[in-house]
Regions:
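Noncatalytic, solvent-exposed loop/strand surfaces
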Residues: 1-90
Length: 90
């Protein structure tokens, strides 16, 4: 089962981890992590060296989402097998 893990670059030591995070494609913007789950659910969270805090989640596309989300000019582009979705990201 996929694990979300923060690793200290200089030492390779794990700082924290989240078990059973799930299969996803991730995008980091500042301290916000956007994770498009394989189920089509979008998870927004904050990441710091101290840990992960989930902010929200929403089903935005169908299952089978395997493409990398793209963020440009305050818009998030996400696709699944059948559609392309554009969301405003504040």
């Amino acid at each position: 089962v996929p694990v979300l893990r923060c690793v200290e670059l200089a030492t390779g030591k794990a700082r924290w981890s989240v078990d059973d995070f799930g299969d996803c494609m991730m995008l980091l913007s500042g301290d916000r992590l956007l994770a498009l789950m394989e189920t089509g659910e979008l998870v927004l969270g904050r990441v710091t060296p101290a840990g992960w805090r989930e902010i929200s989640r929403a089903q935005i596309v169908g299952s089978g989402a395997r493409s990398q989300p793209a963020l440009a000019n305050g818009r998030l582009f996400v696709r699944d097998r059948d559609q392309l979705v554009c969301l405003d990201v504040p």
